[in-house]
Amino acid sequence: YGTKSEAEIAGRVPALLGRLVERFNPCIAVIACNTASTIALAAVRSALALPVVGTVPAIKPAALASRSRVIGVLGTDATVRQPYVDRLSADFASDCVVLRHGSAELVDAAEAL
């Protein structure tokens, strides 16, 4: 999803998960993608009648563990520019400097593994 537009992700993820839930009837759904979670998690939670867990940048545990109070977030371009990441930083790392680096190459690297 790192190379898709936000509009594509916002439309595709809830629709896709809705179809999967109808087909498989799970007890819980996990969005195991930072980009999809930071863009579509709220919409998916509103649309589905089951718990939905998202995977988002681990800013909270990083802030708890940091001694330098400087946190680096490496993600896709779409992930690092999301307001969701702004809120995580404000809520859990307001006393830290949160450096963000977005890279389209992460998608290629992950898919090459």
Where are these regions (language model features)?
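Non-catalytic structural scaffold of enzyme domains
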Residues: 1-113
